[in-house]
Curated annotation (Swiss-Prot):
Protein source organism: Human immunodeficiency virus type 2 subtype A (isolate KR) (HIV-2)
The organism's place on the tree of life at top rank: Viruses
Annotated protein name in UniProt: Protein Vpx
Gene: vpx
Job description of the protein: Plays a role in nuclear translocation of the viral pre-integration complex (PIC), thus is required for the virus to infect non-dividing cells. Targets specific host proteins for degradation by the 26S proteasome. Acts by associating with the cellular CUL4A-DDB1 E3 ligase complex through direct interaction with host VPRPB/DCAF-1. This change in the E3 ligase substrate specificity results in the degradation of host SAMHD1. In turn, SAMHD1 depletion allows viral replication in host myeloid cells by preventing SAMHD1-mediated hydrolysis of intracellular dNTPs necessary for reverse transcription.
Coiled-coil residue windows: none
GO-annotated cellular components: host cell nucleus; virion component
């Protein structure tokens, strides 16, 4: 009988190719962005992407896929914190406009 420590568990035999991993990363980035726009300000999402690209890709010279992976991790953490802090929109999202309720009412006397 073969040593069980030297056998590869089912599903982990290297069947996933690099191309499939990159495709998975693309799908996850798109999915997190679709969900994040319902919970976080678009400006924040855009700034996280820009700063991730500048820091990991431009400054450190990391690959595009690594930069996307780091962005994905940051956005997952941001969404986790948002929900942990008491997001009440777990079912349907905050709606268009993200987390902002809209402009404040005008001051009294100016209506």
């Amino acid at each position: 009988m073969a040593d069980p420590r030297k056998t590869v568990p089912p599903g982990n035999g290297g069947e996933v190719t690099i191309g499939e991993a990159f495709a998975w990363l693309e799908r996850m980035v798109e999915a997190i962005n679709r969900e994040a726009v319902n919970h976080l300000p678009r400006e924040l999402i855009f700034q996280v992407w820009q700063r991730s690209w500048r820091y990991w890709h431009d400054d450190l010279g990391m690959s595009q896929s690594y930069t996307k992976y780091r962005y994905l991790r940051l956005m997952q953490y941001a969404m986790f914190i948002h929900v942990k802090k008491g997001c009440t929109c777990l079912g349907g999202g905050h709606g268009p406009g993200g987390w902002r309720p809209g402009p404040p009412p005008p001051p009294p006397g100016l209506v």
